[in-house]
Amino acid sequence: MKRPSRITPLEIAIGASILGSLLAVAIPSFARNVHATHFAEATDGLARLGTQAVAHADAHKDVGFPKSAPLTPAEVPRGARAVDPPGTWDHPTWTALGFRASPEGIPHAFSFAFDGAGSSFTARARGDLDGDGVLSTFETRGVVGAGAASLTPGMYVEAELE
């Protein structure tokens, strides 16, 4: 008669060590990917903002880019997404650009600023994804040259995983 097979303590130890090794590799990668999805909000927002700014400058050649708008919302969300109170995005520049961080009532993790000077602009997104008080910064720029507005290639990024 054959004895039913049992899992020995050695086999359990081997299985646990393999599982532990897999988790040691997978969990940090997963955490980085989760953070990366959050900073997509900043890059997508700046892409929309840059496109709107270039369209505004091309449509208003006598004015160029709109005037500056302060960091909006003024208090950068810290470690959690925030929903803006009504009126947060009513600044004339945000209205001229048709821009807000997210649709009304949808939480977001970044604040945005626009520094316009007629023939050039810098758009900035600032956030604190982990809530430690250290802000990440994303910037894109644009210029009016040779009669047409355009975005400067590349994006400045500082501490993107903060």
Where are these regions (language model features)?
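Low-complexity, S/T/G/P-rich flexible repeat/linker segments used as non-globular hinges
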Residues: 135-162
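Internal catalytic or translocation cores that form aromatic/hydrophobic pockets or channels
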Residues: 52, 106-108
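Short, glycine/small-hydrophobic-rich surface segments
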Residues: 43-48, 53-101
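Short amphipathic beta-strand and strand-loop transition segments with alternating hydrophobic
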Residues: 109-116
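N-terminal single-pass transmembrane signal-anchor helix
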Residues: 1-34
